[in-house]
Amino acid sequence: MTEHNVRNFNINFGPQHPAAHGVLRLVLELDGEIVERVDPHIGLLHRGTEKLIETKTYLQAVPYFDRLDYVAPMNQEHAYALAVEKLLGIQIPIRGQLIRVLYSEIGRILSHLLNVTTQAMDVGALTPPLWGFEEREKLMVFYERASGSRMHAAYFRPGGVHQDLPEKLVQDIGDWCDPFLKALDDIDDLLTGNRIFKQRNVDIGVVSLEDCWAWGFSGVMVRGSGAAWDLRRAQPYECYSDLEFDIPIGKNGDNYDRYLIRMIEMRQSVRIMKQCVNRLLSDARTGPFSSIDGKVVPPKRGEMKRSMEALIHHFKLYTEGYHVPAGEVYTAVEAPKGEFGVYLVSDGSNKPYRCKIRAPGYAHLQAMDFMCRGHQLADVAAVLGSLDIVFGEVDR
């Protein structure tokens, strides 16, 4: 009779693990090297964001959204601003829409660059993150030149954007596009055909399209499994319906397909950015960049120096805030990680009655057990990397 040793381990992956992307704790049950169960423990970065928003005016709630997915801050603000605008029933001018779309796509590139390069680092490639961060640095400077802040911009406000873009900045963003595509080709050359990178990602973390819908996936996760579902095309907001871009889809639903989709999406984002830059320098060169009804957007500084009414108006907007008609609304945007939704309930006062945040990463993380079961221990880091989890939005 042969003796067979059963080697069952229970190990902790994180919360201080470099591949855990923040403060994730996974409790893994292993049979030798094979993963039998993955139990994500979340809540280590919980700050009570949704409850805090209920105590702030509609304008004061904006900065909380920067701190959710802090890799692409403006995309989160976008969903909130659209929700408030929907309740107020206001339209924002075309220049404001173009600026928003431009910076949303910058956010998408920021997020995908970080994800693609750090996922490469998780499986052992050390060069891509250095190249990726070099490009992200330039984009952070564009954030800073628009809003004064590199990360927590609070730039998209209900009613438009906080301030106009100088023409030189728009030109510089246009000039950045082509050299970036060259840098992207370099990362592409390094990873896409790389034997080791492919062995670590092809046929790992496969999800069928039915499972995607069942788990509530969105964004790259759904497109990797073959559905051309993108809110920018399916439920267009701002001026996306006037812009030309393609939606890449995968056919295997594995880590490698998701990586390829993120690479193509960055190129498509550049394509959208070029169209926005062209319009901001031609037909939308001048004009208002935020709502002009004066009920939501504070008066200009110059006006406040001359007019007492403007000063009083400014004071009221920043102390009491504006009252939003009672009602409820759900607004979603195609954030880099998936469908980022804001469910906003107003009771007619100057503060939200309830603000539910639907973070895409939350739905993706809960499928860790389903995706990793039966894989090797080393694949857990690769699967986690391809989900693109950021803990600010998961724990809120």
Swiss-Prot record:
Gene3D superfamilies: Cytochrome-c3 Hydrogenase, chain B
Membrane topology: Peripheral membrane protein
Functional note: NDH-1 shuttles electrons from NADH, via FMN and iron-sulfur (Fe-S) centers, to quinones in the respiratory chain. The immediate electron acceptor for the enzyme in this species is believed to be ubiquinone. Couples the redox reaction to proton translocation (for every two electrons transferred, four hydrogen ions are translocated across the cytoplasmic membrane), and thus conserves the redox energy in a proton gradient.
Record localization: Cell inner membrane
Protein name listed in UniProt: NADH-quinone oxidoreductase subunit D 1
Record-listed E.C. numbers: 7.1.1.-
Family, similarity comment: Belongs to the complex I 49 kDa subunit family.
Top-level division of the source organism's lineage: Bacteria
InterPro entries membership: NADH_Q_OxRdtase_suD (IPR001135), NADH_UbQ_OxRdtase_49kDa_CS (IPR014029), NDH1_su_D/H (IPR022885), NiFe-Hase_large (IPR029014)
Record's catalysed reaction(s): a quinone + NADH + 5 H(+)(in) = a quinol + NAD(+) + 4 H(+)(out)
Pfam families referenced in this protein's UniProt entry, alphabetically: Complex1_49kDa
Record-level GO cellular component terms: plasma membrane
Binding partners and assembly: NDH-1 is composed of 14 different subunits. Subunits NuoB, C, D, E, F, and G constitute the peripheral sector of the complex.
GO molecular function terms noted in the UniProt entry: NAD binding; NADH:ubiquinone reductase (non-electrogenic) activity; quinone binding
PANTHER family: NADH DEHYDROGENASE [UBIQUINONE] IRON-SULFUR PROTEIN 2, MITOCHONDRIAL (PTHR11993:SF10), NADH-UBIQUINONE OXIDOREDUCTASE 49 KDA SUBUNIT (PTHR11993)
Main location: membrane
Root EC class: translocase
Protein species of origin: Rhizobium etli (strain ATCC 51251 / DSM 11541 / JCM 21823 / NBRC 15573 / CFN 42)
Lineage: Bacteria, Pseudomonadati, Pseudomonadota, Alphaproteobacteria, Hyphomicrobiales
Keywords on record: Cell inner membrane, Cell membrane, Membrane, NAD, Quinone, Translocase, Transport, Ubiquinone
